[in-house]
Amino acid sequence: MSSSNEQICLDEDWIQKFGDREIEFVDEAQKSEVDETEKSIKRFPLSVLQRKGLALINLRIGVVKTGFGGKTIIDFEKDPAFSNGEELPANSFSPGDVVSIRQDFQSSKKKRPNETDISVEGVVTRVHERHISVALKSEEDIPSSVTRLSVVKLVNRVTYERMRHTMLEFKRSIPEYRNSLFYTLIGRKKADVSIDQKLIGDIKYFNKELNASQKKAVKFSIAVKELSLIHGPPGTGKTHTLVEIIQQLVLRNKRILVCGASNLAVDNIVDRLSSSGIPMVRLGHPARLLPSILDHSLDVLSRTGDNGDVIRGISEDIDVCLSKITKTKNGRERREIYKNIRELRKDYRKYEAKTVANIVSASKVVFCTLHGAGSRQLKGQRFDAVIIDEASQALEPQCWIPLLGMNKVILAGDHMQLSPNVQSKRPYISMFERLVKSQGDLVKCFLNIQYRMHELISKFPSDTFYDSKLVPAEEVKKRLLMDLENVEETELTDSPIYFYDTLGNYQEDDRSEDMQNFYQDSKSNHWEAQIVSYHISGLLEAGLEAKDIAVVTPYNAQVALIRQLLKEKGIEVEMGSVDKVQGREKEAIIFSLVRSNDVREVGFLAEKRRLNVAITRPKRHLCVIGDSNTVKWASEFFHQWVDFLEENAIVMDIDATMFE
């Protein structure tokens, strides 16, 4: 066998093993999520699932209408006969969630003999304070309007199936896929870093405020042949850089597919480009998009473009039929209505498909999530490059959805922050981090100026995670809370870092029985929660607005406890677990560490990148609340962090009598 044939065999073996490994991971992650979800659904009654935010009970059908793609959308609202008030209780539902719609017998005295169980699947399209909208797979799934219903969150198997399908395609020997970029991305060769100087010889920047590192990233990404990695630490203007790259590529007559790991990441780029005049379209359900970018959504463009009047007219006819379905129990009448709806839907989809194809084909830039890149609207579309934002937060199979067959990719992210949030026993390395390690500085551009944090707040993350290369911009390095309008100068507002040290009093897990039931695998610390409340009260008294404050903690149980204490004081601020605040920023961040024990166990905080996310959210003020005796001795890394706090923060030693 010749050496070239041997190499082909080696490459093919590598590809198959690579694909099998990712498919195995997808299967493991899906099984873990399904098992956990089914365990909760079986273990707890619907009333408890509602209190956990995983279900909504005692609902009735409100409005029935037609949505994008001719889908039947039902608004479910609270049934006043069984509920107090009109607003839905607090919940964790969001657009895109897969749900089960079930007949609610649980709070009834008993199930009637002629009643049958209803279990219909749908996808959440909108969550309003008074109703939740769900798109059904079929109009024949519409339950009776007289039925009391519940909506329960399920695992979204479609996302896993799309990843699995993509990796199966990855393994197929299709010449179109096996290009130079493909072998670079799987680690079989170094990236081709040849530069087309003609593309950047006379470059003029749209954004005149770009710094030197941003300009370097723009020029490299435009001119490099196949791969660019933009490493953007917190507050370094990664989105501004990507916007400039897109504008420059379009100016050079390139067609771009822009993807992100989240809807918000994609929408932020669309928002910045909305006034550029570039022909562009945002794929995805409008309920998942920022209101400011809806005019660029495929849904709005299809209803206002060619055939828009026809599409709206058919949609109105379908809505009339849908309203009749919920008002009749007669089987013959319902079958006749369903027949009419099916005919109307055929016409709807015919006109819509033609309109959508024209809109997408005419767009120089197409935006979607990574999963959205596998939608039918993009089938057969060709692009000169793909840009993936938040690439460090995406699973490898997600990234391959838009990448198969592409010749050039620009990945942006920060592998020093949290990696993809998946339920797996194995540590997961994103494509972005893998390529940073394997391809090195040849293809990496580091954004080194941050525009968010006071210099003291950014010092530890810069020294620890970014080789001391992350520097604050002049306009942010000295700013404090007291510099804000209407904020008084106090010890709190004059300090960039505050540290309440609970000094080994071991108050961890001071939870009620209810809290233990709802957050079995979570932790809380009542004492720290009281300190959070105390500190926030001090900031508010100094004139800081509640909207400028956020509470961050590693545990959902602590979030619930703090929210409860603040509610008693009439205080409402944004709060969340560390995993949910990545990408966010506030003037002041209060960080409750929770763990306080004599075995020096720090739990979630053992992941260094989780700490990096938490302490890089604030602009002017970081307040840390925790037990130095537990945290400091957990590892050398945490020893260094506590030493930094003790040397640079205002330290308040707290004893157990402070809040008695």
Swiss-Prot record:
Its main location: cytoplasm. GO terms for biological process: mitotic DNA replication lagging strand elongation. GO terms for molecular function: 5'-3' DNA helicase activity; ATP binding; ATP hydrolysis activity; double-stranded DNA helicase activity; RNA binding; single-stranded DNA binding. This is DNA polymerase alpha-associated DNA helicase A. Keywords: ATP-binding, Cytoplasm, Helicase, Hydrolase, Nucleotide-binding, Nucleus. It comes from Schizosaccharomyces pombe (strain 972 / ATCC 24843). Associates with the hexameric DNA polymerase alpha. It catalyses: ATP + H2O = ADP + phosphate + H(+).
